[in-house]
A protein has these predicted regions:
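Conserved glycine-rich cofactor-binding loop
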Residues: 19-21
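The beta1-alpha1 cofactor-binding region of Rossmann-like NAD(H)/NADP(H)-dependent oxidoreductases
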Residues: 44-45, 66-77, 109
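Active-site helix of classical SDR
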Residues: 127, 162
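Substrate-binding pocket helix/loop in short-chain dehydrogenase/reductase
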Residues: 103-114
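Residue(s) in the substrate-gating loop at a strand-loop-helix junction
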Residues: 146
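Conserved glycine-rich Rossmann-like NAD(P)H-binding loop of the short-chain dehydrogenase/reductase
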Residues: 33-50
């Protein structure tokens, strides 16, 4: 881990998957509001570039920690680094995650195992490690799921299931902490143009060429505002909220067929 300045102020936020997309935009919002930041991602160069920008624009204090959360040891290593540095969190943003497309019979298990490690195991482990100090400081937890969390996902079966875990896990913790001043929020964005789509192999999906698309800056702003207000579930875009509700009310045998059509590629 590398530091730019020691941490003296009480408000510190850790963001995983901070080098691009929603995580990057959230880093800007936290820095704008005076938070000290711990930024985690695989790409050391991108983290350094972001840290420099945040320092220049907001005079932010930033630590970067290049970590691949697909490695089971990474969450504990990160926790121990912060413990040794005397850094205590007020906010944890579990944003890191990725997906993959293809019929389950044909997809690669090693890629899916990494997906489960990042999307589920690392998120849960980081929450287990940092939630005690966040609760002690009456802080906030923001977990990033997806509108996929509400639905079965043909051709992205493991990804959709992993996001259902994140949603239910987050809602359960929110209820457990409902008597405290600590808030727990789950962000469930619909389609957003980020590097996620390229990695998942869905850059030409119908989802990214329709009315459900919300710009990444807007998703981050809505997520940030929802977290500050202590909302349990945040779905950016009224059309996404409407689609989720309508599909949840549809017969269970119908919903997978609708989702399958949404993932069909443009011809």
């Amino acid at each position: 881990m590398s530091a730019t300045n020691p941490f003296f102020a009480p408000k510190t936020a850790l963001i995983t998957g901070a080098s691009s997309g929603i995580g990057l935009e959230l880093a800007h919002l936290f820095a704008r509001d005076g938070y000290r930041l711990v930024l985690v991602a695989r790409n050391r160069g991108a983290l350094r570039e972001l840290a420099t920008e945040l320092q220049s624009r907001y005079n932010a204090e930033v630590w970067i920690s290049p970590k691949d959360l697909a490695h089971p040891a990474s969450p504990l290593e990160l926790y121990q680094e912060l413990q040794e540095s005397g850094v205590v969190l007020d906010v944890l943003v579990n944003n890191a995650g990725f997906g993959g497309e293809g019929p389950f019979l044909n997809t690669d298990w090693s890629a899916e195992a990494e997906m489960l490690q990042v999307n589920i195991v690392a998120l849960t482990h980081l929450t287990k490690l940092f939630l005690p100090q966040i609760r002690a400081r009456e802080g906030k937890l923001l977990n990033v799921a997806s509108t996929a969390a509400f639905l079965p996902g043909p051709f992205m079966a493991v990804y959709y299931a992993s996001k259902a875990y994140v949603l239910h896990f987050t809602e359960a913790i929110a209820e457990e902490l409902s008597g405290s001043k600590t808030t727990v929020t789950c962000l469930c964005p619909g389609p957003v143009k980020t590097n996620f789509q390229k990695r998942a192999g869905i850059a030409d999906s119908n989802l990214l060429h329709g009315p459900l698309l919300v710009e990444v800056q807007e998703v981050a702003r809505i997520a940030y505002d929802g977290m500050k207000k202590g909302k349990r579930v945040v779905i950016p875009g009224w059309k996404n909220r409407a689609v989720v509700e309508s599909l949840r009310l549809s017969p269970r045998r119908v919903t997978p067929k609708v989702v399958r059509r949404l993932h069909e590629k443009k011809q």
